[in-house]
Amino acid sequence: MERNAERTKGNILAAAVREFAQNGFSGARVDCIADAAGCNKGMIYQYYGSKEKLYENVIAYEYKLLSSIEAELISRQFTDPAELIDAIVDRYFDFLIRNPEFVKIIMWENLNEAKAVKSNESFAAVKAPIIDCIRQTVRRGREVGVFNEAANSKVVVFALITGAFSYFSNRYTLPCLLNIDLDRQDFLTAHKEIVKSGIRCYLKK
């Protein structure tokens, strides 16, 4: 019975990810989530309490996926501080390529002025591990004389995230306006190098 309950919760969450990614919080329908999950609406409210709480669980799930990538990077030992920066850029891009729903959900939440994120205190700590890792990396870079003293760790994290995220959040409009193909590997590689070199330039002593 417990196994079935966990399976149902998982099916609901997966269906909710797709529905909220496609329609945002306001446009998403619990009926559609229930149909896609193969359950009734009552089970959604039983397991998640409300549409709002289900939406928060979806955001938490998406952030947890990214956090697992960050945790793997944090666990690795980089002898060169700049190598970590390059590795994070590469993994962020890889993650966003594989998880288009993440981009859509975060875009919707930004349009919603981060109401769900602000209402749940647990989200405040979601970036703490990677910020601390970058802070230590910047400090180590200063100690060996390759990073400047004024470098701000949060600025670096912001640049890492937005440098990758903007590539995918603009993937429909900018290709039309600039006549470019964002799926071309050479274009993707060039953009990643711009992000990496820009952050390295900011950090350079």
Q: Which residue stretches match the model-derived regions?
A:
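Amphipathic alpha-helical segments used for helix-helix packing
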Residues: 97-118, 170-178
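Hydrophobic alpha-helical connector segments
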Residues: 72-102, 153-160, 205
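Helix-turn-helix
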Residues: 11, 15, 19-53, 57-58
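C-terminal peripheral helix-coil segments that are non-catalytic and often amphipathic
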Residues: 91-94, 98, 128-144, 159-205
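N-terminal intrinsically disordered/low-complexity leader segments
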Residues: 1-7
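All-alpha amphipathic helical-bundle segments outside canonical DNA-binding/catalytic cores
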Residues: 122-126, 143-159
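Short, basic, alpha-helical segments at the C-terminal edge of helix-turn-helix-like DNA-binding modules
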Residues: 60-65
